[in-house]
């Protein structure tokens, strides 16, 4: 009995075709034991029937062409992102087919912990569809179905960030597609793909495999960790960007990592409204996450940055942005309750990239083509010479204080005490730790009154 006849089992191909390593193992078993063929075909038929039943149950009845979705998989239909202005159904269906169809499986990593858009363990896959378009997608291993994904040409930013406040070192890979950075909407007629976040441990990639089923750890030039391995793979696949990681030359928090002693922290804790998150200051922009909606403030989308609500222990960062797809659309984002300990580092970062001056936005957009975020020596000199408006305000307060001391009135002590009490109540309300000792902060006399200072 030839191996060719085994490969002609259509029911096995249908049931296990999307999982090529498993399909290959089945055929190898059949080649060694041909008498098992009826059993494997019965299993394949049962699996195929389950897949058909699941697909029919999950599919909405007769969806309209304008509601075609670029992401298929389990989950409530309202959570699926629709194609913007979906009249371009030919292009939409092509993108959808490329993501879900059988494709050349190049690399897969089992049991990855995804946080966005779904919080579950899935199999990460990198595939190549007909036409040489490569996809990054996530497969439900139990149902053998694609949950979500994105074509590599549609990926705008890829970040690899340390997970804050964990006892064990971990990294989050963040995939930000075009039209889903939280600032610029997709172009009319273009599909909108989900942002994707998954977590990897700081260890060898034991669950990573080549498309043939060979463990990736057998590779001679394999990186030692999940982070290094996936970063090198993604950099190889990405054509117009690269994986961006935190850099000490850009920003390091003044507050060390609390759960891993001696390790530097690259994040800043902040709030957007009532939602707590982490801000990372990177070489290509500012990221805020890790909960939906993620926001990435690319340099070419930032009009200006200012500081507001400057208190004894905290301040707010206001980022004015302009959409790249709709230049008339501007919006301001406020990241609040940032610890004053991180002000010097944040201010140095803002000046380094000249984000404080809206008149320089065109120059920043021109430099955005350089994804390495490099800048010339003359720009550094300008940044160093640019004086912080917050420090100017502080000196003005000091001068005013000197003048008040000359006209000191003992009867004013009560007002001064009241101001200090208000400031302490403000701090106690937010429950922040006092990192202010020994720092050059806005004078405590400012109390709970917020001063808006634009950089």
From Swiss-Prot:
Biased composition (Basic and acidic residues): 374-397, 432-446
GO terms, molecular function: DNA binding; histone binding; nucleosome binding
Acidic residues bias (residue ranges): 398-416
Coiled coil, from the record: none
Source domain of life: Eukaryota
Record's GO cellular component terms: chromosome; nucleus
Low complexity composition-biased segments: 55-70
InterPro entries, per the entry: PH-like_dom_sf, RTT106/SPT16-like_middle_dom, RTT106/SSRP1_HistChap/FACT
Listed Gene3D superfamilies: 2.30.29.120, Pleckstrin-homology domain (PH domain)/Phosphotyrosine-binding domain (PTB) (2.30.29.30)
Main subcellular localisation: nucleus
Primary role: Histones H3 and H4 chaperone involved in the nucleosome formation and heterochromatin silencing. Required for the deposition of H3K56ac-carrying H3-H4 complex onto newly-replicated DNA. Plays a role in the transcriptional regulation of the cell-cycle dependent histone genes by creating a repressive structure at the core histone gene promoter.
Family per similarity comment: Belongs to the RTT106 family.
PANTHER family, sorted: FACT COMPLEX SUBUNIT SSRP1, HISTONE CHAPERONE RTT106
Name of the protein described by the UniProt record: Histone chaperone RTT106
Taxonomic lineage from the root: Eukaryota, Fungi, Dikarya, Ascomycota, Pezizomycotina
């Amino acid at each position: 009995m030839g191996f060719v006849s085994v490969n002609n089992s259509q029911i096995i191909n249908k049931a296990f075709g999307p999982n090529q390593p498993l399909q290959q193992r089945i055929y190898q078993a059949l080649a060694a034991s041909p008498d098992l063929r009826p059993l494997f075909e019965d299993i394949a038929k049962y699996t195929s029937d389950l897949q058909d039943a699941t697909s029919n149950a999950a599919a909405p009845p007769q969806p309209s062409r304008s509601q075609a979705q670029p992401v298929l998989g389990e989950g409530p239909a309202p959570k699926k992102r629709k194609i913007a202005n979906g009249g371009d159904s030919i292009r939409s269906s092509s993108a959808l087919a490329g993501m879900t169809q059988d494709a050349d499986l190049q690399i897969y990593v089992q049991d990855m912990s995804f946080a966005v858009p779904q919080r579950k363990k899935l199999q990460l896959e990198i595939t190549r569809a007909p036409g040489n378009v490569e996809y990054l997608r996530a497969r439900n291993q139990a149902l053998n179905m694609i949950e979500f994904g994105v074509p590599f040409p549609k990926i705008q930013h890829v970040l690899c960030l340390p997970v804050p406040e964990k006892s064990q070192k971990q990294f989050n890979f963040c995939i930000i597609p075009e039209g889903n950075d939280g600032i610029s909407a997709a172009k009319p007629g273009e599909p909108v793909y989900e942002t994707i976040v998954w977590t990897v441990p700081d260890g060898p990639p034991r669950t990573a495999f080549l498309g043939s089923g060979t463990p990736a750890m057998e590779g001679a030039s394999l990186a030692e960790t999940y982070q290094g391995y996936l970063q090198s793979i993604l950099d190889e696949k990405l054509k117009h960007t690269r994986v961006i990681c935190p850099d000490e030359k850009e920003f390091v928090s003044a507050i060390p990592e609390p759960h891993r002693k001696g390790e530097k922290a690259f994040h800043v804790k902040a709030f957007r409204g009532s939602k707590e998150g982490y801000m990372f200051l990177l070489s290509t922009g500012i990221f805020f996450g890790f909960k939906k909606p993620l926001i990435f403030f690319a340099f070419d989308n930032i009009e200006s940055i200012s500081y507001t609500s400057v208190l004894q222990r905290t301040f707010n960062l206001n980022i004015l942005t302009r959409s790249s797809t709709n230049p008339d659309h501007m919006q301001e984002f406020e990241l609040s309750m940032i610890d004053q300990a991180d002000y010097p580092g944040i201010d140095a970062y803002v000046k380094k990239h000249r984000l404080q001056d809206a008149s320089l936005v065109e120059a920043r957009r021109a430099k955005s083509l350089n994804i390495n975020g490099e800048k010339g020596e003359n720009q550094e000199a300008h940044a160093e010479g640019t004086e912080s408006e917050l420090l100017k305000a502080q000196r003005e307060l000091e001068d005013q204080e000197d003048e008040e001391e000359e006209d000191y009135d003992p009867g004013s002590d009560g007002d001064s005490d009241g101001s200090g009490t208000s400031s302490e109540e403000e701090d106690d309300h937010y429950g922040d730790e006092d990192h202010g000792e020994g720092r050059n902060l806005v004078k405590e006399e400012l109390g709970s009154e917020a001063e808006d200072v634009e950089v």
